Amino acid sequence: MIIPEHFLYVLYIVLSTTVSVCSSVYIFSIFYFGRKKERDNHSKNTGNITILIPVYNEDVGLFNRCISSVNKQSTPFIVIGNGCNLPYREIVEDNGGRFVYLRDNVGKKGAMAEGIKRVNSEYVMLLDSDTVIPKNAAKRLIQKFDTETGGVGAEIKIIKDSNKFVYYPSEMLQKLRQLSFKAMSHFGRVLVLNGQCAVYRTGLIRDFILSREFLEPRFLGKKMVIGDDILLTKHINGMGYKTILAQDVIARTKGQGSFKKLVKQSIRWSRSGYINFIKGIKDGSLFKNGFFYSFSMIYVYTLPVLTLFLMVLRGGLLFNIIVRRGILNGGRLFILSFTHIPRILNSVIFPYAGIKIISIISVVTMIYLIIEKTEKNRVRFLSYGSIILLVMFLTAIYAVMSLNNHDKWLTR
């Protein structure tokens, strides 16, 4: 069956207009809600907290920095040696912490399960062994809790690295995530509480962490590899509790050691995100966390696929014009074909152009948001950091195409 060319023009304009409108709404929402100050109505919370840290073959110097920062919190902490003992035990015990040695490497989730059994406090901070937290971070995070809050995450930044092709894209990736999460936090439902540093009510997550649903999650009939942070956040959201991002607590974490590892991390995050998105549609949780949460999820996970489809559609139209009219006139005729649209579309030419102008404004707004709090090397940050945009697009498409291959972690 031959599809009429006019129909393809209509389809292109309708879809591209829809994407432009949704992108503008998303970006302007981030600009408005993400810049609002946090509501300060629960600052008297002083509940007790334990910090739980799984460790596996971590860089000793970085682990030492992590434990030193934890020691300054003046709160109990437990480190689970996941198939590793010295020198981590010495570092932990020298700083007044408790070290639990597991002979076998049971994975991060397994180590978390062993650790949560030993936590008796009202709150628990889950902290990665390569993450450094500021003084009083634990106290400030639990002060964000009210009776309706189940989890609070810290803002994450990347520890500066000499490899600019890894550091700047990694920092850009984190910044894009934080911009979105800040806006979602305003509504009390974030997509992910960053796994590097987040605080939860112990009573809400203890049984879940010990459950098979957390330790051995399944997708498409087989065991899947998915981030513990996505599972925990989805669990808290599903219980009806708020999940929020603390904008005044900044934890710094180690980036990926090479560009190849950064790409693999992006694939893992994308694949985990799509699995969570599909499961959210299947169990209905996608539509139970408020309009902005649902809109953000649908926009973020359909955008790469729609963008690829529009690229293919536009390329097909251009190829068709070149074949019919000749390669020399192809480019000019392709442009003219969108200005001499069939009469049925005459009424949408002006609004279509107006929407494109709004889209340009929204892109400029996004760039402003990205560089707003970048104090140094803004040009370098944008130029090197923008590499991650292409990586995110390509890895998202690859993640969709390889959803069935979800049993490998890819990065450590």
Regions of interest found by a model, annotated:
Residues 219, 286-299:
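Membrane-water interface at loop-to-transmembrane-helix junctions
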Residues 5, 9, 29, 167-182, ...:
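Short hydrophobic helices that act as membrane-entry/anchoring signals
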Residues 407-412:
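Short, charged juxtamembrane terminal tails flanking transmembrane helices
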Residues 259, 263, 287-292, 383:
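Alpha-helical membrane-protein architecture signal
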Residues 9-13, 27, 31-35, 41-44, ...:
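Membrane-embedded multi-pass helical conduit in multi-pass membrane proteins
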Residues 47-284:
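Non-transmembrane catalytic domains and loops of membrane-associated enzymes and transporters
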Residues 84-86, 288-292, 405:
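Short, solvent-exposed helix-helix connector turns and helix-capping sites enriched
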Residues 1-68:
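N-proximal low-complexity "stem/linker" segments adjacent to membrane-targeting elements
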